[in-house]
Amino acid sequence: MSETLKRLSAVIESRKPANGGDPDKSYVARLFSKGDDAILKKIGEEATELVMAAKDARAGADKSKVLYECADLWFHSAVLLAQFDLTPQDVVNELARREGISGIEEKAARKAD
């Protein structure tokens, strides 16, 4: 996992209320204090903004907005992971587990579980 993601994960973890995160001083601590629904709402908003940026880029707009919105989505996804005591490394591990497996086969295996 990249050093940037490791640092980001550590900062997000430090913003949890149990670790002294102050909702009056930290956006992430505020999200944690508001709970799952606030975090999920932000992810929905960021996902929609990413979709719109991609559509705009396909129509000729600045594709850097795709990058910005994707970064926002990744960031808020990292907050959600931390909310469930998971990390970006857990996602990397899952991707590594799936490596070399057909997407169709992998999805079928999940349905069988």
From Swiss-Prot:
Similarity comment: Belongs to the PRA-PH family.
One Pfam match: PRA-PH
Biological-process GO terms, alphabetical: L-histidine biosynthetic process
NCBIfam families named among the record's database cross-references: histidine_hisI (TIGR03188), PRK00400.1-3 (NF001611)
InterPro entries, A to Z: HisE, PRib-ATP_PPHydrolase-like
Catalysed reactions listed for this entry: 1-(5-phospho-beta-D-ribosyl)-ATP + H2O = 1-(5-phospho-beta-D-ribosyl)-5'-AMP + diphosphate + H(+)
Residues spanning the membrane: none
Key words, A-Z: Amino-acid biosynthesis, ATP-binding, Cytoplasm, Histidine biosynthesis, Hydrolase, Nucleotide-binding
Entry-linked CDD domains: NTP-PPase_HisIE_like
Subcellular location per the Swiss-Prot or TrEMBL entry: Cytoplasm
Example of a GO cellular component annotation carried by this entry: cytoplasm
EC number(s) on file: 3.6.1.31
Principal place of residence: cytoplasm
First-tier enzyme category under EC: hydrolase
Magnesium found in the keyword field: no
Protein's name in the database: Phosphoribosyl-ATP pyrophosphatase
Pathway(s): Amino-acid biosynthesis; L-histidine biosynthesis; L-histidine from 5-phospho-alpha-D-ribose 1-diphosphate: step 2/9
GO molecular function: ATP binding; phosphoribosyl-ATP diphosphatase activity
